[in-house]
């Protein structure tokens, strides 16, 4: 666990963030939020990414809300003991007291997703009490516009299982106004496909909100990471598959982005 909350680099430095989707105590990776494949032990994987120079780490318990489970604090405590970079934790957050419990377990930032939909005031209350710098609102968005129409994306919750009827761009604006310090934006259409970010979604939300946007969903190669911050205008890029299964290391990603003239933190 780091003692510094929020991004440690300058606002212009782009961050690379490995993501650990966790269920039943194991890191998994799926495609379009389904067909999950085991990727390993979360503590071991977290330690590896810390050693590789990741800027931050995101840990998401992807079935806590849909299963109605409590927070998996023991695993979070173990992960936090192995990393010395900002750790964002999400999944199963239902009330402000859950935010405090996760911070006490070693998290630096808390990601709120489904609970923000059912109780938007939770975001405001958590930000007022703990500070916007440690509140992240996660948005899982699916494109719902037809070909030829203006692009539209809908927010889904409960691990992508429930449609909300909410427009993703408008929701991001609202959450930023309520005090979210960052938006973690995942394209459900691109998740696990390795076909690249939904750059139109990323750029539209990045341009619409005054807080950093973390692009997520679809990274399959190094070029995709660079596109997330150049074309997509994201402040940070999040990936899982290319790291979990040994396709690239965090250092390789940073070296590639630096060669493209993108400001990244190099060890």
UniProtKB/Swiss-Prot annotation:
What is the disulfide pattern of this chain?
none
Question: What's this protein's family per the entry?
Answer: Belongs to the HisA/HisF family.
Q: Which GO terms describe its cellular component?
A: cytoplasm
| Pathway the protein acts in | Amino-acid biosynthesis; L-histidine biosynthesis; L-histidine from 5-phospho-alpha-D-ribose 1-diphosphate: step 5/9
Task: Write the Enzyme Commission number(s) for this entry.
Answer: 4.3.2.10
Reaction catalysed?
A: 5-[(5-phospho-1-deoxy-D-ribulos-1-ylimino)methylamino]-1-(5-phospho-beta-D-ribosyl)imidazole-4-carboxamide + L-glutamine = D-erythro-1-(imidazol-4-yl)glycerol 3-phosphate + 5-amino-1-(5-phospho-beta-D-ribosyl)imidazole-4-carboxamide + L-glutamate + H(+)
Instruction: Determine if Nucleus is one of this entry's keywords.
Output: no
Assembly and binders: Heterodimer of HisH and HisF.
Q: Any idea which residues are catalytic in this one?
A: 21, 140
- Name of the featured protein: Imidazole glycerol phosphate synthase subunit HisF
Q: Which organism is it from?
A: Bordetella avium (strain 197N)
Keyword annotations of the record: Amino-acid biosynthesis, Cytoplasm, Histidine biosynthesis, Lyase
Task: Give the protein's biological function.
Answer: IGPS catalyzes the conversion of PRFAR and glutamine to IGP, AICAR and glutamate. The HisF subunit catalyzes the cyclization activity that produces IGP and AICAR from PRFAR using the ammonia provided by the HisH subunit.
GO terms for biological process, alphabetical: L-histidine biosynthetic process
Example GO molecular function: lyase activity
User: Which HAMAP family does the entry link to?
Assistant: HisF
Tell whether Cytoplasm is among the UniProt keywords. Answer: yes
